[in-house]
Amino acid sequence: MVLYTRPPRLSVSRETFFGRQTPVVIPVFKEGDSIKLPEGLPQDLESLLKESYNSKAVSPEPGSVAKLPYRGGLVVTAGCGAPGDLEGVRRGFAAASRQVVDSFEEAQLYLVGLDTVSSTEAVIGALLGAYRLEEFKNTRKRKLQQLWVYGGEPRLDYAQAVAEGVYLARDIANAPPHRLPPAKLAAAVEDLFSKFDNVDVEVFSYDRLLEEGFGGIVSVGMGSEEKPRLIIIKYRGGAGEPIALVGKAVVFDSGGINLKPSQGMTLMRADKAGGAAVVGAMWTAARLGIKASIIGLIPAVINVPSGSSYLPSDVIRMWDGTMVEITNTDAEGRLILADAISYAAKQLGAKTVIDLATLTGAIVVALGPLIAGLFTRSDGLARAFEEASRTTGEKIWRMPMEDEYAKSLTQPAQAGEIVNAAQRYGGAIFGALFLERFVHGKEFAHLDIAGPGIAFEAGSLAPPYWPEKGMAPGYGVRLLIEVLSRMARGGG
């Protein structure tokens, strides 16, 4: 079972817990030169909070927290910025959750006066802030198991399902490679979705991949004794042509024969973050019953050097027949994605193909550790992602699909039709243009999540609802769910 870490349970409470041993989290908002507090607080507590603000012990800045003794219990303030600032609310409640996760088994969220959207994001922030991956530790610190919600109008089922999907993606992305090689990942996904009557999981074995000509997936995985798999999750939530989500799952990426430098190589356990996000999004879509037909494809491989590894100058026949000349074995993600993308477009009849991949270091150089690069020629799809980004706080930036650059995929090829790695500059664009060749005219979006997917050196820039210590944050699950929901409603 992959879902090692479960979010705290959510329940509605009909009364406040002031004066009990259970801490109460209270949002604090900016209002001019003062603060705005939620309605219905006891007068003495309101006075305490205002006095604490005047003494600078309490701040409304997003993500700031303070712990105040009150009536023998504990109040935790959550700085949320201006009223209506969804990111501020997420940060505030996530930071507050971090303050109690290791000390209390339960906490109460005071959401009086918050609308449905804000109160839902507050709950999501608190759930995500409580994440701890402790499966591989002998001593576990997390105590928090229950969140009580008082007031507001949060969509608790939605918040719980989203948090489960993000936790699942985090667990997969951060799992040590020996614990989740391709075959075990495939088996875990089969087990995970077996509880749904409207979800089918099909796993292509190495022999089947070889027999059916998935040259990209097979070649990248040849160097490892743990052979590759293609995991296909089919969710029957609605009629019509399916939407395909394709996620890169390189369980560990050493670079292959073009070996990476040792510095930072341990982060390459998270080179499966795109595939992890697709698994998490498929889980959440099924839990929520999104009214759409959705297919998740996760090509899973290990890219390591050995006597049987694929080599620079090899020419690979891809599933759709394209002949690709290998110029860099560390540009492996696009090879496994291309096979899955073309299969989704041509064999599975997808109307739209969306892929997520920790694809290039170039996108991290361009956009830093918090922002994913969005590549699409569809203005409608771009709008859906941009609106979803504003709602979820998962940052994106639309990047160009420059046709002139596409020449660099073909001109250097000596034996093949195209190369897998073109010139040095504009690497993120070349990666997107390479993948676009395999969608066969279908609507397409490529998300290069190398920055936020792995959280490269995010440090103090990371929001408090990301895991601590630079772990992969499960980026993309919330973004995908919002986009899929909009598409199901006809808004994407």
From Swiss-Prot:
Its main location: cytoplasm. Coiled coil: none annotated. GO terms for cellular component: cytoplasm. It catalyses: Release of an N-terminal amino acid, Xaa-|-Yaa-, in which Xaa is preferably Leu, but may be other amino acids including Pro although not Arg or Lys, and Yaa may be Pro. Amino acid amides and methyl esters are also readily hydrolyzed, but rates on arylamides are exceedingly low; Release of an N-terminal amino acid, preferentially leucine, but not glutamic or aspartic acids. It holds the Pfam family Peptidase_M17_N. The active site is at 260, 334. Its EC number is 3.4.11.1, 3.4.11.10. Its cofactor is Mn(2+). Binds 2 manganese ions per subunit. It is found in: Cytoplasm. Mn(2+) 1 binds at residues 253, 330, 332. Mn(2+) 2 binds at residues 248, 253, 271, 332. It comes from the Archaea. Keywords: Aminopeptidase, Cytoplasm, Hydrolase, Manganese, Metal-binding, Protease. GO terms for molecular function: manganese ion binding; metalloaminopeptidase activity. Belongs to the peptidase M17 family. This is Probable cytosol aminopeptidase. The gene is pepA.
